[in-house]
Amino acid sequence: MSEKQIVLIAGDGIGEEITNSARAVVDAAFAKAGVTANWIEKKAGGAAIDAFGEPLPQDTIDACQAADAVLLGAVGGPKWDDVDPSIRPEKAILGLRKALGLFCNLRPVKIYPALREFSPLKPELVENVDFVIVRELTGGIYFGEREEAQGEGPNEFAWDKETYARYEVERIMDVAVETARKRSGKVVSVDKANVLASSRLWRKIAKEKAEANPDINMDYYYVDNTAMQLVTNPGQFDVLVTTNLFGDILSDEGAVISGSLGLLPSASIGTGTSLYEPIHGSAPDIAGQGIANPLGTILSAAMMCRYSLDLPTVADSIEQAVTAVLDVGYRTGDMYREGFKKVNTQGMTDAVIAHLG
């Protein structure tokens, strides 16, 4: 029986509740597949500040680097608003990205038929929406040189510099190609090559990757057109690959299209151990009440099984169980409507486990 080494970082707020839920689902799915998990619990974020005076202890970094995967709940909250900016809880995420070499964020956007009514778009527009945004994480304008505001009056100015090196673009394109190869084989590379020099390099390399991978259908969109297409015809997309800045914006647009942030998972992958987490925050207002929606974390765990643990059938089983639970009408409070079955965190967890294939 194979044993997977998984670091579990509950984090802050509802983090403990939702990671416990995902852990229970993974253990149940593993048991059916003849796999075991060694869960290694570590602290990061506000919980680590409270315990150790820093958001990301070296002990947590060491454990993550040695593990097969990392599953994270959420970090941050108003409790730590007044701490020194250098040790804010969110610094834990940036530190993990650096320590683990995480250069790529995968953000799936899927409309579940049972939840189509939650999307702000018309039902006919979101039918069959199921795409992945592949976002570059460590380059671009967020990490470039900058100058804060200086000067006075109408001549006051500030600037930010975007730089992309060939290797940064090549490796994110490789992830997009491999992701598409496991799906429909369609990739849209998103840039602003009609204006930005960095985008012209981006598009040049994207075209080279398309030529080197003839089984992949690569198209090229400007970011402004992509933003429009996401709300007028989102079903056309399968894999979108883009820069750090554009990916940040388009990922949030995609999340809104889904209509339920509580369901959306994400993965950050790179040269070392990969990190999996739901896209929602720590929700301190409902922490400890047992009513948080655990599905985003459960689906993040499914991504972990698929991308890091080489357990695609386990990932399928978890994802299919979530779909089945939604189809039969189970809803946590954030998704509840009259006529459905309202459940708390534990109730949703039990329902998913009961529907595992």
Across the structure, where does each feature detected by a protein language model lie?
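Buried hydrophobic packing segments
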Residues: 22, 26, 206, 297-308, ...
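Glycine-rich phosphate/pyrophosphate-binding loop and the adjoining helix
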Residues: 138-139, 144-183, 187-189, 193-195, ...
